[in-house]
């Protein structure tokens, strides 16, 4: 790993920690950062520990983990397809995962906007992964031309699959109980509000197991950037590696979606910025992971407190609104750059 890549990874990780500490300290009850650090080290007063450990830390931890998962998923998909627009929120993975999760929220709902503990802890993540895998399977199968994945078709077919999945979601919201549908609609905006440890733990498990596995294939990813024929000549088992990494990318995106909803554009923006800053031929996984974590916790800090700081009112925005506001212009920039390159 290049020294520049390592340095940027450390920088983004440090910035993410700083923003996380600030996020833990601000809110209705403002706390000195020193008190927050004391609580995290095992000390602090009982009331402070309650605010930090039970109310705020699950939200911040979920944001960090979701950012890592989305970032790595986007980096893998963009590398495998050799297309900077191939992120899970564009090619249909997030939409498929959302359809699966919403099915559990609406169909397993109690009518009061809540679902049973077992369905929430197990059903939503599993349904999200299943929905994401189905969407990926459809996009992958329809994007192959003459035995090779067509990078242009990936995005076009992905947009179509996403539209179909979003239509299914809309239908479930219409037929579902109004309280369950309202909960699902709020979740679909991409929000870290009221996150609990039960939301963070599944994403943590996915990141802890799958990120190291993905990083084991760094050399294979670099070879795949050169083309399938070159990668095969270098000894890479292209079909097997591509399938395995595609499954990893899908599971990471689906688990992140299950944990916080389909937070837009994190998987698109983080890999591209990391690639530009590191000057590599592809998005580096570790740097992208740290940048994704930084992006989400910073966006959540602004979503939670931005309107109050501007004296607009005591309102909180979904984090997906902030990431979309940042990511949409960058998407247009990427499309414009691709058009100029033709």
Task: Name each model-derived stretch.
Residues 1-342:
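Alpha-helical transmembrane segments in inner-membrane proteins
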């Amino acid at each position: 790993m290049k020294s520049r890549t390592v340095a940027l990874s450390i920088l983004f990780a440090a910035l993410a920690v700083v923003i996380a500490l600030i996020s833990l300290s601000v809110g209705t009850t403002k706390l000195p950062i020193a008190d927050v650090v004391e609580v995290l080290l095992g000390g602090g007063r009982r009331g402070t520990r309650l605010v930090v450990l039970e109310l705020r830390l699950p939200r911040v931890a979920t944001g960090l983990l979701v950012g890592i998962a989305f970032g790595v998923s986007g980096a893998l998909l963009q590398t495998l397809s050799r297309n900077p627009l191939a992120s899970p929120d564009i090619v249909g993975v997030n939409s498929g995962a959302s359809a699966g999760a919403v099915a559990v929220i609406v169909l397993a709902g109690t009518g009061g906007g809540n679902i049973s503990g077992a369905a929430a802890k197990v059903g939503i993540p599993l349904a999200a992964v299943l929905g994401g895998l189905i969407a990926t399977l459809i996009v992958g199968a329809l994007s192959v031309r003459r035995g090779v994945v067509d990078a242009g078709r990936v995005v076009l077919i992905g947009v179509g699959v996403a539209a179909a999945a979003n239509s299914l979601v809309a239908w479930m919201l219409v037929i579902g109980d109004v309280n369950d549908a309202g909960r699902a609609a709020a979740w679909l905006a991409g929000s870290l509000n009221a996150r609990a440890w039960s939301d963070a733990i599944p994403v943590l498990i996915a990141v802890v197991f799958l990120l190291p596995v993905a990083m084991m294939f760094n050399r294979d990813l670099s070879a795949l950037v050169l083309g399938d024929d070159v990668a095969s000549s270098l000894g890479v088992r292209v079909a097997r590696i591509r399938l395995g990494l595609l499954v990893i990318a899908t599971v990471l995106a689906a688990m992140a979606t299950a944990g916080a909803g389909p937070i837009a554009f994190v998987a698109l923006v983080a890999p591209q910025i990391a690639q530009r800053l590191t000057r590599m031929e592809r998005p580096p996984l570790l740097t992208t992971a740290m940048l994704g974590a930084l992006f989400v916790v910073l966006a959540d800090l602004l979503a939670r407190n931005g309107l109050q700081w501007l004296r607009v009112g005591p309102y909180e925005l979904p984090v997906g609104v902030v990431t979309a506001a940042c990511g949409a212009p960058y998407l247009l920039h990427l499309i414009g750059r691709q058009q100029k390159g033709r």
